Each structure stands twice: as structure tokens, then as C-alpha cells.
């Protein structure tokens, strides 16, 4: 499976490169006489040896509104994260080596991607996925292809306010990380029926429609997109660290729907939309009409941002990841080299099947949560494959399953934007065990580095310690219950951008 999926992505990449090689005819005579791979090699050499990250210095692109608060690299983005939209008023800062080889990055249509390969050494070792509830490096003491990603993209021009513009993105990943992005109804048999270690997921496919005369610019996004809130994201380069916080691991990942984002002024941005729910395609039997409403407030000339988001508004009745979730995120820039990000959420599901029904004592099976239940004795709604039940009073067949979490990042950069350090601390309370499979409180602490070679090669080593306070939650053997309350991992990944 790994070989065939990897070959498919490689074939698509080479096909695009070969098909678009003729675009190089518009370059200089020297470029015209060079082959595609020669131009690609020169692009990487220029990226690694230029005095700035990427190509030799060029005029700063025009921007509307407050200045970008961060440097990217070494940070994932120059702007504070906001989902469901491009950053209205921000230019397209990115150049890509593949497009430099094809047409010197002279068009707004782009093909790009990356390979992310990760490793970890862990104190857990009893089962194939024994690092759970940690993600995405869930297989202990191993080296894995986390993501091979390929993007086709055109960004709308939201800097100008004169005319309508449009954009799109079609993004695919292959690798271990598909296990976290899979949506019911979108090639989901790979995970929900076959439980494949590696798989393919078209993680984003959407259109953007930019309307410049509504507020100070409005973007309407239609399709499958990353859920709106969160400091972190599913795609490897969009994160400070290799591993993800527990807070991020157990909330909503993607949605199929329509979302409108309006920039009212330099301070306020508002969002509203509808979708089929978290990780459920509209044609899936698990789809539920779901609303979202968010608002962001920026001050200190872009240095502070407060972002509130009700990301999934519906009945919250148990289904495939049908959580109702409310987020509050605060971003603060201290100076040119230090900033912090803090996120809190509360989420819940109703009428969740009780894994402890008729069982006293009730054993927590962690990532194997549903195997311990008297499933045949639980009336509708029944347990769903890939959606944990809860651990409640043994006399109840169903119950309310809430959880809450908070995470803080402290970030520092140096070495002329080539290196950054991350300190992450979080607390997560899975009150009924519905998210992780174990009803317990967790803490997680991480120190990581982010080192860039130019703007195309990233290395992210980290040391992470986590603990479950009420019962064992780590190192579960295949088909068995967790055996440890503490887990220590040394991990990292290498991202090669093209």
C-alpha cells in the first residue's frame, strides 16, 4: 500500500512537471537551454545559499491593513491563524521550487508540496499504536512516512479592493497521517473498514470567491476545508512542532460546507457558515446540518489577536465525531523574536453509548475503547466504528460526554530567521473518556526546535513528557488496556518542500 500510494503521488508530481515544462519557453535563453531538473536544482541551490530565505531579496509585496506580526520561516505563517479563509488583505508570500523550475513562479497557479518523514523513540512499546493518545507519531520506536503532500492552488488577490477574484485548492496527502484527517464518506473505508496503516486523503478541495465591496473584503469558501479555529493544523509545515497537542488531536479536523469571512476593519473579522459536521461528507449517513460562527479582534497594530469560535453548532447527538465545540484563542507578540499563543476549548456529545453499561468495575481500554462494552445491550444510538463510546454510570445506557483543554505555546526565534524554539504546556480533561478512550486528566510538556535550511528543508526535533492522572492511558497492547500513566518521547521530522 505504501509503495503504490507513494508511486501515485510521485507520478502525479512528475506528470505536472513534465506537462508544464513548456512554460519554461518564456524564460531567458539560458533558462530555455536548461532542462527542467537543472532549473529545479538551481532553485534549491539559490534557496540554500541566498542571503535571505528563499530567492535573492525582492521588494516586499504590497499588504493591506496591519503589518504581518511574525516571520515565516521560521514560524509556520506570517499571520495569526484563521481558518476557512485566506487572510484578507495579505499577499501571497510563498514561492516554490517546483514552480521556479516550471515558470520562475510567474503565474498565480501553483503546484507544490512536501515529503514529511518522522521518527520517535518512546517509553511505550507494547502495541502497534502504543504511543496513543499522542498523535501523529503514534507508532512507537519507528520511522514513518507521515505525509507526502501535493497541492494545486490559486489564491485570490485580497489585497486589492477593486474587483471580484477567485481561487481554489486541491490538496492530497498520503501516509500515516491520513488516519487523523479521514472524513466519513471520503475514501474512509481505508481506515474505518480496513484500518490501513497508510492511506490517501484529499484533505482539502474548495473554491474561494472574493467580494471586495462587502466590508473591507469578504471571502466565501465552498468545499472541504480545515476547521476554522486552532493554533495547529493537519498539514506538517503549518505547525510549530512535529507532534500535536492533545487539545488539537481530539477536536474537529475538516468540514464540508460553505463559510463566509468578512473583514470589517483593521480590528474586527467575523465568520459564519454551515457544513455537514466534523469529519462527515454531506453524502455520508453521519452528516448533520451544522453551523459555525466566529469573530476575531486584533489590536496593538496586529501584535494582539483574540479569536472566539463556535465551530460546530448542532444537536451534538452521538455520531461520527459529532462534537459541539467552543474555542477561545489569544495570540500575543512580545517583540520581534518572542510571542505566545494560548487556546482553550470546551466540547461535548450527547446520548453517547455507555461503555460501562452493566460493567462494574469498568475497564478503560484507551485506543481500544469500544472492545470492552456490552454493545449488543446498548439501545439506539448504538456504537459506531471509529467513534468512541463514553465511560459513565454502569446503570445508564447513554450519557453526556464533555471534555475541555487548554494549551500554551511560547515561541522564540534567532539565527536570521533560520531557527526557533517551542515550549508547549497543556492540560486536557477527558471527563468521560469519549475522546481518548480513558476517562482521566492529562498534562503534556514539550520542548522543541525548528531549524530551516533556506525555505525548503525543515528539521524539528522535540522532547515530550505526558502524564495521565486518574488511570493508565499509555502503552496499550493491541486489543488490550493501557498499562502506563507516563510517557516520554524523543521525536522529530524532516520536511522537504518542493
Predicted segments with their positions:
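Domain-scale selection of a single, long terminal region
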Residues: 1-13, 173, 206
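Hydrophobic alpha-helical targeting segments used for export or membrane insertion
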Residues: 10-22, 492, 498
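Outer-membrane beta-barrel pore domains
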Residues: 26-51, 55-58, 62-63, 67-70, ...
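Solvent-exposed loop/turn segments connecting transmembrane beta-strands
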Residues: 250-253, 277-288, 314-323, 400, ...
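Short, histidine-centered active-site or binding-site loop motifs used for metal coordination
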Residues: 274-276, 312, 346
